[in-house]
Amino acid sequence: MAHKKAGGSSRNGRDSDGRRLGVKKFGGEAVIGGNIIVRQRGTKWHPGSNVGIGKDHTLFALTAGQVFFQTKANGRSYISVIPPKAAEAAE
């Protein structure tokens, strides 16, 4: 049994790269179907209308339109995509 640790080894130096999470398309931005809106761990943001959710909780646009963020009375943040016709009516 060795009484001294073998040289040439390092216990440090394992700082992994960031995962590139966060909002990719902000409120008011135009998106087309399939565009990623948010990459997240867990559901910080929930899918609203015309937004799908992937198995890793990525939110993506199901149709073309404008991104819309809102917080509902239950305290959850929702992201929706408003189609072009509805977006004009909302303005």
From Swiss-Prot:
Gene3D superfamilies assigned to the protein according to its UniProt record, in alphabetical order: 2.40.50.100
The organism of origin for this protein: Beijerinckia indica subsp. indica (strain ATCC 9039 / DSM 1715 / NCIMB 8712)
A GO MF label: structural constituent of ribosome
The gene coding this protein: rpmA
One family name in Pfam for this protein: Ribosomal_L27
InterPro entries assigned: Ribosomal_bL27, Ribosomal_bL27_CS
Any single GO CC term annotated in Swiss-Prot or TrEMBL for this entry: cytosolic large ribosomal subunit
Alphabetical list of PROSITE patterns matching this protein: RIBOSOMAL_L27 (PS00831)
Positions of the UniProt region annotated as Disordered: 1-22
Intrachain S-S bonds: none
A single GO BP: translation
Protein name: Large ribosomal subunit protein bL27
Keywords: Ribonucleoprotein, Ribosomal protein
Domain of life where this protein originates: Bacteria
Family membership noted in the UniProt record: Belongs to the bacterial ribosomal protein bL27 family.
